[in-house]
Amino acid sequence: MKLSFDSIVTKEPIRLAIIMENVIFDTRDEYGELHSESTMRKKYHEDLKPIPGAIEAFKNLNSITDLRNRKIFDVNIISTLSLTNQKSYINKIANVQKWFGDEALKKLIFCQDKSSIRTDILIDNSFKPQNFPDTNKFTLNTPYLQIRYGTDETNFYQIKSWTDNDYLDVIKKICIDLGLLVI
């Protein structure tokens, strides 16, 4: 069943965080066998290409309004800190600006510990216990709900692709289930 946003109301914008690596930008092709060598390249993150449909999905999520014409989502792009390649910050910023525009730069957040992010929902491609010091994979006691992008993990809500609008149905269902949206 397809859900519409036409009859939905939100009390305040829902904080939605999307991981940059392998959710918005495809880093798998770049990493390959030369992971450490390729990440040290001067323009590594500047050369990355968005995952198909990611630009449109980001813009779409940022433009959705509720029945009262209030913005539903506050969407941020989250990227990991690189302790070995300080130039990666400049390149990541340039890449986000190149593909997503100046407004997206205001929504780019760098962090080492994802659990420190103040968000309602995180769209990520993996769970790494080292990024959640007080959390284990079984309890997933994180401060936000997690959605997996492009994986086959069955313990999580799934978004398989940005190229169809199924991602909207997944996000909307979760928001309704959590009481963040009212029909």
Curated annotation (Swiss-Prot):
Pfam families (alphabetical): NT5C
Gene Ontology MF terms: 5'-nucleotidase activity
Top-rank lineage group of the source organism: Viruses
Positions of disulphide bridges: none
One BP term from GO: pyrimidine deoxyribonucleotide catabolic process
Protein name: Uncharacterized protein R758
Lineage summary: Viruses, Varidnaviria, Bamfordvirae, Nucleocytoviricota, Megaviricetes
